[in-house]
From Swiss-Prot:
Ranges of biased composition (kind: Basic and acidic residues): 319-328
SMART domains: RHOD
Name of protein: tRNA uridine(34) hydroxylase
Cross-referenced InterPro entries: Rhodanese-like_dom, Rhodanese-like_dom_sf, Rhodanese_C, TrhO, TRHO_N
Catalytic class of the enzyme: oxidoreductase
Catalytic residues in the record: C200
Catalytic activity: uridine(34) in tRNA + AH2 + O2 = 5-hydroxyuridine(34) in tRNA + A + H2O
Source lineage: Bacteria, Pseudomonadati, Pseudomonadota, Gammaproteobacteria, Enterobacterales
Keywords on record: Oxidoreductase, tRNA processing
GO biological process, alphabetically ordered: tRNA modification
EC number per UniProt: 1.14.-.-
Chain ranges of the Rhodanese domain: 146-240
NCBIfam families assigned to the protein according to its UniProt record, in alphabetical order: PRK00142.1-1 (NF001133)
Amino acid sequence: MPVLHNRISNDELKAKMLAESEPRTTISFYKYFTIASPQQTRDALYQVFTALDVFGRVYLAHEGINAQISVPQSKLETFRQQLYTFDPALDGLRLNIALEDDGKSFWVLRMKVRDRIVADGIDDPSFDASNVGDYLKAADVNVMLDDPDAVFIDMRNHYEYEVGHFENALEIPADTFREQLPKAVEMLREHADKKIVMYCTGGIRCEKASAWMKHNGFNKVWHIEGGIIEYARRAREQGLPVRFIGKNFVFDERMGERISDEVIAHCHQCGASCDSHTNCKNDGCHLLFIQCPQCASKFNGCCSEQCCEELALPEEEQRRRRAGRENGNKIFNKSRGRLNSKLSIPDPAE
């Protein structure tokens, strides 16, 4: 019987990855296409990726695939060939290569079958996810940014927008993509005659969002090909001004890629200029927040004095207090409400 799941502890896997000397490349990709049997596809692809020492996070559903992974550089071309020949729909698929990468983004391969590769909350049977907006390449993005008739819409979470975004882009204030979709329609009604340009990290969210906007009567809709990652890469390669300001948040150990030198966010504890996300060191919290080096030292990597005090307790007492809590082990746990309640940050949506 083939091994279809990891059998080694996280701590052991992470230590092994950190000790690796071979460089790795962090890659993200997605594809909306029909998968008749997601579980069967998942099991077959897991064996392919495991044989190539691929780490990362992969989601499959009837609607397609969404992946963020790291691949040993010596096996990168073999990986590309095997991915492209795995299914005709994946042939020639664009791979977004990380902009800043130390090769330590992942240490285990997790591959899951889900209802959707992006949780959108859409239950309208008449919605056609393939009726997407037009792609915008890097040069066209810069032209659109100077067009007074264009409105740029950020389809990422509030904490992603906080550390970096395109010039004058509108934030759709929400904690999840499924909450953003109806809000985007509502907020943009007054701009229905404008050119709507949608973007996200790698393209997967803004592609579906563009189809949703068209479904709701918006006719002039574009989305940035390959998202922020592809835009920044192509703009640099082509010698174009990079019009994204700040840092691009990513959902792996790096938690961000520097796009421009500007730091547009602030430490959530003291207000100093800072755009470095971290998780509260208290295992009973794990709040995702922005913390400067000074506050990291002052609070021992915790988000509050309460968590700092709890972290200093004996491990047995910490475990007792964590029992039954909902907050632990949510690595990207930063709902606006929870963040504000723990750090007393005013909610701009209120």
